[in-house]
């Protein structure tokens, strides 16, 4: 089984949401580790947002608070971490991991990028 997802977001949308809602918004979307690593970079936060959206698309589910209430996972159940060389990697928790198990997906690859006013993420899941 092979699943893919991609998402593109305007960095300013994330910057505005963080400015307006602060920690309340951050705690809903990013894990503590993600926030500590990226809180000073709207570009990095936006890229991780895009990765969460892309992963949800690959899993065939929505994210809580954005439609699909019957089959949604929480934002923090999809985590973007980094290996020792800084390469992004995907960690799933809770309902997101359960859905990956249902699909037979055991390995993930994630690519993040940003340029100008946009950030993009591409996610591939393999059985």
Curated annotation (Swiss-Prot):
Gene Ontology cellular component annotations, sorted alphabetically: cytoplasm
Enzyme nomenclature, EC number: 2.7.8.7
Protein origin, superkingdom: Bacteria
Cofactor names: Mg(2+)
Binding site for Mg(2+): 7, 53
A Pfam family of this chain: ACPS
Enzyme class: transferase
Gene3D superfamilies from the UniProt entry: 4'-phosphopantetheinyl transferase domain (3.90.470.20)
Keyword field contains Metal-binding: yes
Recorded catalytic activity of this chain's protein: apo-[ACP] + CoA = holo-[ACP] + adenosine 3',5'-bisphosphate + H(+)
Keyword Transmembrane helix found: no
Similarity remark: Belongs to the P-Pant transferase superfamily. AcpS family.
Function of the protein: Transfers the 4'-phosphopantetheine moiety from coenzyme A to a Ser of acyl-carrier-protein.
Protein name in UniProt: Holo-[acyl-carrier-protein] synthase
């Amino acid at each position: 089984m092979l699943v893919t997802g991609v998402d593109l977001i305007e960095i300013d949308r994330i910057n505005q949401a963080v400015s307006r809602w602060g920690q309340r918004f951050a705690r809903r979307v990013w894990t503590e580790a993600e926030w500590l690593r990226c809180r000073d970079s709207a570009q990095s936060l936006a890229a991780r947002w895009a990765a969460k959206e892309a992963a949800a698309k690959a899993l065939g589910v929505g994210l809580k608070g954005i439609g699909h209430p019957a089959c949604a996972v929480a934002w923090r159940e999809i985590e973007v971490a980094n290996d020792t060389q800084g390469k992004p990697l995907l960690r799933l928790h809770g309902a997101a991991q359960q859905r990956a198990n249902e699909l037979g997906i055991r390995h993930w690859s994630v690519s993040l990028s940003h340029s100008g006013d946009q950030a993009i993420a591409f996610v591939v899941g393999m059985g």
